[in-house]
């Protein structure tokens, strides 16, 4: 029953969403946004790191999923987004969490069935999928959508891994099988 932390990075607002996966069932654990008021970028990055670290400490996730960088029209915005992503990833790595990245289009496709869905469509579907009584804030809904996408990826990868190795039973074995399936092209090396 892995706990998944999804992050929607931003240099002003970083959304987060935490779910627990129990087979095909998803349980909502929490969500919100790290709001950053600092004007200088180094202070904003420090705030993101502290916020993500606090969330990790509070919820003790097993996995960390984050949106990949997309090509923005404004190079300065893309650089700031990349720095915010990197800061959140460092917080996860410092807590020994495996990091998984997903393209925004794949996240939208997974949650709504439409790769070009807008934020409100994602928010509506996340609310329905997790059976929430109220809609989460938009950035939190995006983060939850990233976590949901990772949960679906786990489910698919475990089916494939178990077909190849029926003896997989423990949570650690499942995570290692998932990572080996995802990174089998040699981009990353796994210990153990």
UniProtKB/Swiss-Prot annotation:
Keyword Ligase recorded: no
Annotated Pfam families: RuvC
UniProt-listed Enzyme Commission number(s): 3.1.21.10
Active site positions, chain numbering: 8, 67, 139
Cofactor: record remark: Binds 2 Mg(2+) ion per subunit.
Functional note: The RuvA-RuvB-RuvC complex processes Holliday junction (HJ) DNA during genetic recombination and DNA repair. Endonuclease that resolves HJ intermediates. Cleaves cruciform DNA by making single-stranded nicks across the HJ at symmetrical positions within the homologous arms, yielding a 5'-phosphate and a 3'-hydroxyl group; requires a central core of homology in the junction. The consensus cleavage sequence is 5'-(A/T)TT(C/G)-3'. Cleavage occurs on the 3'-side of the TT dinucleotide at the point of strand exchange.
Similarity comment: Belongs to the RuvC family.
Identification of the protein by name: Crossover junction endodeoxyribonuclease RuvC
Species the sequence originates in: Haemophilus ducreyi (strain 35000HP / ATCC 700724)
